[in-house]
């Protein structure tokens, strides 16, 4: 069995959202905010010969933080793909932002740690 290596970087952001399709009076329909964490995992079976690693963790951190900063202190609903800003759609949004530059991307996790909620997208 071939070993598989996975590396993960995490970023944080704060953002507001609301769920417009919720019934009138629902707390989820009202504008509210959360602190979020997002983690991106890249997988490889073979390490880079020149460096002995799966990928450059610094570059992964840069790209993940750049994506998170796009959302930071903003309204999630304003971003294409996040009109219904569930954790699931946030996972898809981050995957779509990173997938082109990170072919080994295998997992995105978005969490709201203060309320103990998270979603994992396995690619």
Predicted regions and their residues:
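Charge-rich, low-complexity N-terminal segments
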Residues: 1-123
């Amino acid at each position: 069995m071939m070993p598989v290596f996975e590396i993960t970087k995490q970023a944080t952001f704060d953002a507001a959202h609301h769920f417009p399709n919720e019934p009138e009076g629902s707390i989820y329909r009202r504008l509210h905010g959360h602190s979020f964490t997002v983690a991106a995992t890249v997988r490889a079976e073979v390490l880079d010969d020149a460096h002995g690693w799966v990928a450059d963790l610094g570059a992964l951190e840069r790209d993940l933080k750049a994506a998170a900063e796009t959302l930071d202190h903003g309204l999630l609903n304003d971003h294409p793909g996040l009109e219904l800003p569930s954790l699931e759609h946030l996972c898809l949004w981050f995957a779509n932002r990173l997938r082109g530059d990170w072919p080994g991307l295998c997992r995105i996790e978005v969490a709201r740690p203060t309320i103990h909620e998270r979603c994992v997208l396995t690619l």
